[in-house]
Curated annotation (Swiss-Prot):
Subunit details: Part of the 50S ribosomal subunit.
Family: Belongs to the universal ribosomal protein uL4 family.
Reported function: One of the primary rRNA binding proteins, this protein initially binds near the 5'-end of the 23S rRNA. It is important during the early stages of 50S assembly. It makes multiple contacts with different domains of the 23S rRNA in the assembled 50S subunit and ribosome. Forms part of the polypeptide exit tunnel.
GO CC annotations, alphabetized: ribonucleoprotein complex; ribosome
Protein's recorded name: Large ribosomal subunit protein uL4
GO biological process assignments: translation
One Pfam family in the UniProt entry: Ribosomal_L4
NCBIfam families: rplD_bact (TIGR03953)
């Protein structure tokens, strides 16, 4: 299939031939759910920790004798039912990350791209050239080409030697724009693509993805 390449003004400047499955695969919602859940789990720090009755300070001595006081019996001030006592079934540091099979990740990526392309919210732009990084220029470009109701934008970029230093200048120009998420074509995440109102590709980024999918 061919996709239209746009310039900074949103005008067509050519086409790019890519394999059909990138934008015309069957959308698998269950697979998208599993892929997004996996990405979010892998982001978790897992540093949560609460002290048990064995770890809180104090409470080594029995507060009062067993009988004869009229009060409920107590063996330690570290008991979970006491104020300042330890907690039961406490969260402890753990690793939440797990691996998703490569074929599942690949199909999930094709699903989210096909979903966005089928919804007419995916655009491909020619590569940008810069004399110097300019956030103002890219912010103006985004506001010009996006739809009126669009808030979140995912921008997929790809690095190539032919671009010279323009790749780094593009990153510097885009990274501080509100509600814009940068996505690297070499390691594309499903989460920012799925939750974006619009998805933009540079020509180089789509070419790299096409080469990867073709194998």
């Amino acid at each position: 299939m061919e996709v239209v390449i746009l310039n900074e003004n949103g005008d067509s400047v050519g086409n790019l031939e890519i394999v059909d499955e990138i934008f015309k695969s069957e959308v698998n919602n269950n697979l998208l759910y599993e892929a997004i859940k996996n990405e979010l789990a892998n982001r978790r720090q897992g540093t949560h920790s609460t002290k048990t009755r064995a770890e809180v300070s104090g409470g080594g001595k029995k507060p009062w004798r067993q009988k004869g006081t009229g009060r409920a019996r107590a063996g330690s001030t570290r008991s979970p039912i006491w104020v300042g006592g330890g907690k039961t079934h406490t969260p402890k540091p753990r690793d939440y990350s797990y691996r998703l099979p490569k074929k599942m990740k690949r199909k999930a990526l094709l699903s989210v791209l096909s979903l966005k392309y089928g919804s007419n919210v995916l655009k491909v732009f020619e590569d940008f050239t810069f004399d110097a990084p300019k956030t103002k220029r890219m912010a103006s470009f985004i506001s010009k080409v996006k739809e009126p109701n669009t808030r979140k934008v995912a921008f997929v970029v790809g690095k190539d030697e032919s671009l010279g230093d323009n790749y780094n200048k593009l990153l510097l120009s885009l990274r501080n724009i509100k509600d814009l998420k940068l996505v690297n074509a070499d390691s594309m995440s499903i989460h920012p693509l799925f939750y974006a109102d619009e998805v933009y590709f540079t020509k180089t980024a789509l070419s790299k993805l096409n080469a990867r999918i073709k194998g």
